[in-house]
Amino acid sequence: MAVRSPFVVVMGHVDVGKTLLLDKIRGTSVAYREPGMITQHIGMSFVPWQAVEKYAGPLVDRLKLRGKIWIPGFLFIDTPGHAAFSNLRKRGGSVADLAILVVDITSGLEDQGVESLKLIQSRGVPFVIAANKLDRVYGWKSVENRPFLTAVEDQEWHAIATLEESIGKLVEQLSKLGVEADRYDRVRDFGRQVPIVPTSAVTGEGIADLLLVLAGVSQRFIPRDKLTVRPGPARGVVMEVKEERGLGVVADAILYDGVLKKGDTVVTAGIDGPRVAKVRMLVMPKPLEEMRDPEDRYMAVEEVKAAAGVRIVADGLEGVVAGAPLMAVRDPGEVQEAVKVVGEEISEIKIETDREGVIVRADTFGTLESTVLFLRQQGVPIRKADVGPPTHKDVVEAVLSRRKNPAYGVILAFNVKTPPEVEKEAMSSGVKIIRGEILYRIFDEYIKWSQEVKTKTVEQILSQMTRPGKIQILPGYVFRRSNPAIVGVKVLAGTIKPGVTLVKDGKEVGRVMQIQKSGKPVGEAAAGDEVAVSIQGDVMVGRQIKEGDVLYVYVPDEQARQWLFQYKQYLREDELKALEEFLKAGRRR
């Protein structure tokens, strides 16, 4: 059986040169193609191994790869980034066979790069690191399209020193994330170390090295069985759904197995479950040699064999979501079985596992899956996760979740817009909607918001609790003996406020009515303050209390437990000591 080319996705932080790197790689296949050798794809670029061999030239021999590579070439996904990789999903793993993690060699691994790395690792996809922007290394002498191994031999010592320092920092960053890596020509065990290839998407330096390292990694880590294309109806994944003038709703899909034919029935999925559609037309780009008119770039074909990127024109594609599985069926009796398989697959993504947690919404099945995975890794519980914009039901679910934990009253919306009526309902219900197109920024905003909510919630709870306090009646400062007793006191620890109950030796003596300092009423007195207090109750100075007595603020048992076991960090040291003394006095009684 035929062997297909591995699918390759390019990932990394914003502005690291992902798109430019892809353009440079695509350029090699065009420049070094042979007539009729280049097959055009929808959403993918094919780089044949023969073109790589011609482009890389002596480096192929230097690395002893000539005649050893059995893959036909590489199929690069045209759209770089997190979303494309997320949508390349299938049951049990990823449609992507290889990934290139692009890092800016001058600044190292950044937030989105870390997120991309974790996503790649979660799917178990072999990857190579392209340390890009080599041309910006101080003192580096660039020559167009030169292999890195050749270029590095032509550099001054200060350029090499700067390069080594940058790679060393990157290796250290990766090590802290549990990834052992090194410059690719120093890697001795590719099973243990991730290769780093210095590249320049501007000059093309290191591109040859990158393609050869990709080839080596693919041969080492991708089982031949995974790349073997089996006969029969196609299997694939939907990458994009859009409306095309004159064609209606079309789906751009990647086929990783089998053959898709005009007239086939395809089973895929929308927000509300599996969808069945009949293929009316299959569209592919014309070969490069035949592209005379930019407006006439596509042609209709009768069938498409995996691996391929194809545009499907079919009745019934409305509402299909990117990242959905795609199964072709030719026997009408097998349609229901395919519907069942697709339904089971998408139900694994649409999760409602935690009793309490946040609500998650994403634009595609793939991004939903990766969003949920990322949030789970960060310890964020999820009550509900689904594809599509937030709904009325989501707001209701968030309100219910908030009752258990105010920080769960939120909808995290990745790459989806919120309908105005839902936005209005959420606002009136006190439900927060956090939306964005970059996952780690949504997470950061959620963490910031949840901390604010937690702080506000704790402040509200603490404002209703009695803070511990300890006072001493000052000798010579009895202004009134009873009804109410008015005495001068010094606050020895903690805080006293009007309304608190005072106790002596575990027995209640009365309630503080008013506190005055320098003849004026105040709302509270803290440790060190000397104030006058009026005490209402069955108390008389000279009987129940005397000059020099130490009194404690009465803290109810339940609140005392809360202070000690839930909110201890919110007590000052003197307040904690006063609480412990109060409890000890109560036990003695």
Curated annotation (Swiss-Prot):
<dbReference type="Pfam" id="PF11987">
    <property type="entry name" value="IF-2"/>
</dbReference>
<dbReference type="InterPro" id="IPR009000">
    <property type="entry name" value="Transl_B-barrel_sf"/>
</dbReference>
<feature type="region of interest" description="G2">
    <location>
        <begin position="37"/>
        <end position="41"/>
    </location>
</feature>
<dbReference type="InterPro" id="IPR004544">
    <property type="entry name" value="TF_aIF-2_arc"/>
</dbReference>
<keyword id="KW-0547">Nucleotide-binding</keyword>
<feature type="binding site">
    <location>
        <begin position="78"/>
        <end position="82"/>
    </location>
    <ligand>
        <name>GTP</name>
    </ligand>
</feature>
<keyword id="KW-0648">Protein biosynthesis</keyword>
<dbReference type="GO" id="GO:0005525">
    <property type="term" value="F:GTP binding"/>
</dbReference>
<feature type="region of interest" description="G1">
    <location>
        <begin position="12"/>
        <end position="19"/>
    </location>
</feature>
<feature type="region of interest" description="G3">
    <location>
        <begin position="78"/>
        <end position="81"/>
    </location>
</feature>
<dbReference type="GO" id="GO:0003743">
    <property type="term" value="F:translation initiation factor activity"/>
</dbReference>
<dbReference type="InterPro" id="IPR027417">
    <property type="entry name" value="P-loop_NTPase"/>
</dbReference>
<dbReference type="InterPro" id="IPR005225">
    <property type="entry name" value="Small_GTP-bd"/>
</dbReference>
<keyword id="KW-0342">GTP-binding</keyword>
<comment type="similarity">
    <text>Belongs to the TRAFAC class translation factor GTPase superfamily. Classic translation factor GTPase family. IF-2 subfamily.</text>
</comment>
<dbReference type="InterPro" id="IPR036925">
    <property type="entry name" value="TIF_IF2_dom3_sf"/>
</dbReference>
<dbReference type="InterPro" id="IPR023115">
    <property type="entry name" value="TIF_IF2_dom3"/>
</dbReference>
<feature type="binding site">
    <location>
        <begin position="12"/>
        <end position="19"/>
    </location>
    <ligand>
        <name>GTP</name>
    </ligand>
</feature>
<dbReference type="GO" id="GO:0005737">
    <property type="term" value="C:cytoplasm"/>
</dbReference>
<dbReference type="InterPro" id="IPR029459">
    <property type="entry name" value="EFTU-type"/>
</dbReference>
<dbReference type="InterPro" id="IPR015760">
    <property type="entry name" value="TIF_IF2"/>
</dbReference>
<dbReference type="Pfam" id="PF00009">
    <property type="entry name" value="GTP_EFTU"/>
</dbReference>
<dbReference type="InterPro" id="IPR000795">
    <property type="entry name" value="T_Tr_GTP-bd_dom"/>
</dbReference>
<keyword id="KW-0396">Initiation factor</keyword>
<dbReference type="Pfam" id="PF14578">
    <property type="entry name" value="GTP_EFTU_D4"/>
</dbReference>
<protein>
    <recommendedName>
        <fullName>Probable translation initiation factor IF-2</fullName>
    </recommendedName>
</protein>
<comment type="function">
    <text>Function in general translation initiation by promoting the binding of the formylmethionine-tRNA to ribosomes. Seems to function along with eIF-2.</text>
</comment>
<feature type="region of interest" description="G4">
    <location>
        <begin position="132"/>
        <end position="135"/>
    </location>
</feature>
<dbReference type="GO" id="GO:0003924">
    <property type="term" value="F:GTPase activity"/>
</dbReference>
<feature type="region of interest" description="G5">
    <location>
        <begin position="200"/>
        <end position="202"/>
    </location>
</feature>
<feature type="binding site">
    <location>
        <begin position="132"/>
        <end position="135"/>
    </location>
    <ligand>
        <name>GTP</name>
    </ligand>
</feature>
<feature type="domain" description="tr-type G">
    <location>
        <begin position="3"/>
        <end position="224"/>
    </location>
</feature>
